[in-house]
């Protein structure tokens, strides 16, 4: 009888440990039951960023020591999004590796909710509340069991994972330090109430990168409305350079939405790679600029850094908390490193005859102390006599201090009979330029006092000149 009793006890202990490794345990302290937690929490290592080799199990204190959790360092919690394959995307180990490279002593935990994430999208979207609840209970347990400060916790959620992070942040005993939303999902969340999605109340600071908001509200892959303290819209947030939308539309038209997962990855995942870029290239962070609209940004009207009007993108963002969310914009390259250099250009077109041209193509070339950037194309919707126009251009290289610039007015792509006997022209005396990254203002004067810019002819040349207005700040 005694041997049978011992056998039953041993069997009970074995079953309890088996249950623990399947997603949770009934904790002995305080009677807390974690057995219904389905999400898994893997503490990955710098040596093996791709595999879930060691799991932290809520309610099982030994799992924390066995995985060598660092109680004195910050913790990153990475939450993936919807998946068709049921497997981790290739960006997960890349982000883990970048986090460890920047913060070698930190803990990088990857949340596995793959089973729930591979259902039909509306089903997986609904599961974000349960996943968020799992993550919150896990974080609360770390704080209560080990007195781990939540000020050391930074949640990073991609797509649906961003909303799961928001739910988690709203349910923790104390606010976590930061949540970064990486292109939070749009469908089912654009019009959702704050408790069901990512919002500024979910952490001490919430920053969001919006990279694929193309389409009508509620139908775009990424959420369009601001949901953080600082919401950044690279390249307007609609679509990213290097991502071929024409090809995407063609494939969808021919094959339907079956391959949409592959097609949306480029712009949707750009949010992740922009954040990775900020971790790896800390010496040259990209800058974003606060603006009321992307249209105003395209005119170059928002390159001010006064009163927190500009900010770093990604990891080294300044934690600015305003009453209203700050919408910020920037341009990027098509590949890492993504940083570019923004310039506002203001030109006054004058002449003896009243003239007006629509949708005119130009090229501008900038020459500096370090490098040059030539033949940058831009289009002005309108060019008219005695009017001043402001527009944004950017370079992919740091050209240093500006010294000279050239402006060329391109011919129309179509033939006009009037071009046989005359060519439109304007007189330009000065061009004003403001550099976003350095906040310096430069005035360029026509090399021949005034320049006659003629359509389809040689470029007009302007050189750096001195002007009293250069001393003004802003």
Curated annotation (Swiss-Prot):
Keywords: Calcium, Cell membrane, Chylomicron, Disulfide bond, Extracellular matrix, Glycoprotein, Heparin-binding, Hydrolase, Lipid degradation, Lipid metabolism, Membrane, Metal-binding, Nitration, Secreted, Signal, VLDL. Homodimer. Interacts with GPIHBP1 with 1:1 stoichiometry. Interacts with APOC2; the interaction activates LPL activity in the presence of lipids. Interaction with heparan sulfate proteoglycans is required to protect LPL against loss of activity. Associates with lipoprotein particles in blood plasma. Interacts with LMF1 and SEL1L; interaction with SEL1L is required to prevent aggregation of newly synthesized LPL in the endoplasmic reticulum (ER), and for normal export of LPL from the ER to the extracellular space. Residues 1-27 form the signal peptide. InterPro entries: AB_hydrolase_fold (IPR029058), Lipase (IPR013818), Lipase_LIPH (IPR016272), Lipase_N (IPR033906), Lipo_Lipase (IPR002330), PLAT/LH2_dom (IPR001024), PLAT/LH2_dom_sf (IPR036392), TAG_lipase (IPR000734). Glycans are attached at residues 70, 386. Disulfide bonds join 54-67, 243-266, 291-310, 302-305, 445-465. It comes from Rattus norvegicus. The active site is at residues 159, 183, 268. This is Lipoprotein lipase. Tyrosine nitration after lipopolysaccharide (LPS) challenge down-regulates the lipase activity. GO terms for molecular function: apolipoprotein binding; calcium ion binding; heparan sulfate proteoglycan binding; heparin binding; lipoprotein lipase activity; lipoprotein particle binding; phospholipase A1 activity; protein homodimerization activity. Residues 417-421 are annotated as: Important for interaction with lipoprotein particles. SUPFAM superfamilies: alpha/beta-Hydrolases, Lipase/lipooxygenase domain (PLAT/LH2 domain). It catalyses: a triacylglycerol + H2O = a diacylglycerol + a fatty acid + H(+); a 1,2-diacyl-sn-glycero-3-phosphocholine + H2O = a 2-acyl-sn-glycero-3-phosphocholine + a fatty acid + H(+); 1,2,3-tri-(9Z-octadecenoyl)-glycerol + H2O = di-(9Z)-octadecenoylglycerol + (9Z)-octadecenoate + H(+); 1,2-di-(9Z-octadecenoyl)-sn-glycero-3-phosphocholine + H2O = (9Z-octadecenoyl)-sn-glycero-3-phosphocholine + (9Z)-octadecenoate + H(+). One of its GO terms (biological process) is positive regulation of inflammatory response. It is an enzyme of class 3 (hydrolase). Belongs to the AB hydrolase superfamily. Lipase family. Induction: Induced by insulin. Inhibited by isoproterenol.
């Amino acid at each position: 009888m005694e041997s049978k009793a011992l056998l039953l006890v041993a069997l009970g202990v074995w079953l309890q440990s088996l249950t623990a490794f399947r997603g949770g345990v009934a904790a002995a302290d305080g009677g807390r039951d974690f057995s219904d937690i389905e999400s898994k929490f893997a503490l990955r290592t710098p040596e093996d960023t791709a595999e879930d080799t060691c799991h932290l199990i809520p309610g099982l204190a030994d799992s924390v020591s066995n995985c060598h959790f660092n109680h004195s360092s910050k913790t990153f919690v990475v939450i993936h999004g919807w998946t068709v394959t049921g497997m981790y995307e290739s960006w997960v180990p890349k982000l883990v590796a970048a986090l460890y490279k920047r913060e070698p002593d930190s803990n990088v935990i990857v949340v596995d909710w793959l089973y729930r994430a591979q259902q039909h999208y509306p089903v997986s979207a609904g599961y974000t509340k349960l996943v968020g609840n799992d993550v919150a209970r896990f974080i609360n347990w770390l704080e209560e069991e080990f007195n781990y400060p939540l000020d050391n916790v930074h949640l990073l959620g991609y797509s649906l994972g961003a909303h799961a992070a928001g739910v988690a942040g709203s349910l923790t005993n104390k606010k976590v330090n930061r949540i970064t939303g990486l292109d939070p999902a749009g469908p089912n969340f654009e019009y959702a109430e704050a408790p069901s999605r990512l919002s500024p109340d979910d952490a001490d600071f919430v920053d969001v990168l919006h990279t694929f908001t193309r389409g009508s509200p509620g139908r775009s892959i990424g959420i369009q409305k601001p949901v953080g303290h600082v919401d950044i819209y690279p390249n307007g947030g609609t679509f990213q350079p290097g991502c071929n939308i024409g090809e995407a539309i063609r494939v969808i038209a021919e094959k339907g939405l079956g391959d949409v997962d592959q097609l949306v990855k480029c712009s949707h995942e750009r949010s992740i790679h922009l954040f990775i870029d900020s971790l790896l290239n800390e010496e040259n962070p990209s800058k974003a600029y606060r603006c009321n609209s992307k249209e105003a940004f395209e005119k170059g009207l928002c390159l001010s850094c006064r009163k927190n009007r500009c900010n770093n993108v990604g990891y080294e963002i300044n934690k600015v908390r305003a009453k209203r969310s700050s919408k910020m914009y920037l341009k990027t390259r098509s590949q890492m490193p993504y940083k570019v250099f923004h310039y506002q250009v203001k030109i006054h077109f004058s002449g003896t005859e009243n003239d007006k041209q629509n949708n005119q193509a130009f090229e501008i070339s900038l020459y500096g102390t370090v490098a040059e950037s030539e033949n940058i194309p831009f289009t002005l919707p309108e060019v008219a006599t005695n009017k001043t126009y402001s527009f944004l251009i950017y370079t992919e290289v740091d050209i240093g201090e500006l010294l000279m610039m050239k402006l060329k007015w391109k011919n129309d792509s179509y033939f006009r009979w009037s071009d046989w006997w005359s060519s439109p022209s304007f007189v330009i005396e000065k061009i004003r330029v403001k550099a976003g990254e350095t906040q310096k203002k430069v005035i360029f004067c026509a090399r021949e006092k005034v320049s006659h810019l003629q359509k389809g002819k040689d470029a007009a040349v302007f050189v750096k000149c001195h002007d009293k207005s250069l001393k003004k700040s802003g």
